[in-house]
Amino acid sequence: MTKSVIEILSAEEMRRTITRLASQIVEKAGDLTDLALLGIHTRGVPLAENIAKQIETLEGIAVPVGALDITFYRDDLDQIRVRTPSKTDIPFDLNGKNLVLIDDVIYKGRTIRAALNAVNDYGRPEVIRLAVLVDRGHRQLPIQPDFTGKKLPTAKEEKVKVYLQDLDGRDAVELIK
């Protein structure tokens, strides 16, 4: 069976969406002195870096960015293809931070549950919020993003593929049916 690919966000639409996410994060954060972004490997990391660049452009403040690997915190290791763990790099103290976890797509909520468990091993932020580029629904856990770039109702058998310039040489979001 041939799969069809539908572009959901073009490079320009992604740029605008990232700018909007940055603006929403700034508005909700209020005081930016304790704001920090933590991208979830793999695509959440460059996404967090792009959002941080936009915040700096908008506000003139450099927001610290970290990278979180959740491989060994997952509850579905027996069901997924195990990848080589990435490096967690958190170059700031999490304690007391206004932390925004960033991921490309939220689906069942299990990645975010694992990320929350991992964060607790590194410190205790004052508040943890969640920003995602795409929310495709079908949650299995009571986890919802605070900031969403695009809500995209999908069928369970469909896939959402995010392409990022830093990793893939282009920016786009596609729905694979």
UniProtKB/Swiss-Prot annotation:
A Pfam family matched in the record: Pribosyltran
Keyword annotations from UniProtKB, A to Z: Glycosyltransferase, Transcription, Transcription regulation, Transferase
GO molecular function: uracil phosphoribosyltransferase activity
Catalytic reaction(s) noted: UMP + diphosphate = 5-phospho-alpha-D-ribose 1-diphosphate + uracil
UniProt EC number: 2.4.2.9
Domain of life of the organism encoding this protein: Bacteria
Function: Regulates the transcription of the pyrimidine nucleotide (pyr) operon in response to exogenous pyrimidines.
HAMAP family: PyrR (MF_01219)
Family under the similarity heading: Belongs to the purine/pyrimidine phosphoribosyltransferase family. PyrR subfamily.
Stated name of the protein: Bifunctional protein PyrR
Annotated organism of origin: Picosynechococcus sp. (strain ATCC 27264 / PCC 7002 / PR-6) (Agmenellum quadruplicatum)
Gene name of the record: pyrR
